[in-house]
């Protein structure tokens, strides 16, 4: 994912990449050069309505995205994958109901059918709102892509599950995107409140860097 594309496409979300660890990457942009992906990340606050999916599909075709990561999908088990489908994309989803009782939430990934990928069941088994896939790259080691959603109101157990999933993903080359609801972290200075320091430690200890320098919100 090129940095410019990242800045223009993110909507109040976060993107982290594993770089400078054992020589795997020299720059964040090396990831996109390896597997030629362009990622759109958004907090949809429901992708259930047909009108939203039609608008999303048009936007994706216009800008040539190959991976779409969505938080707050608001999907439920009574909505089939066929109803949520986008032309030319494979859908991977996890509804909130798979984790706990409650409305809203949920995450999903749309991956271009031109990319070879599989769901990472060991990571998807963690009881948190996250979805993980592995992109198959012929020339180098495969890349893990994950989307995470941390609700402003989240249990300690669910938060630990999410952090554990991220730690496991960090053993591989990976991109992690999502909405983590940590608005008080200063990514330039790493200053944060006591409530946020565990997440900052997680990012730093696993050699992630923030790949999002700016974002926009669309109503």
Where does each model-flagged region fall?
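A shared catalytic/ligand-binding motif for oxyanion handling
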Residues: 1-219
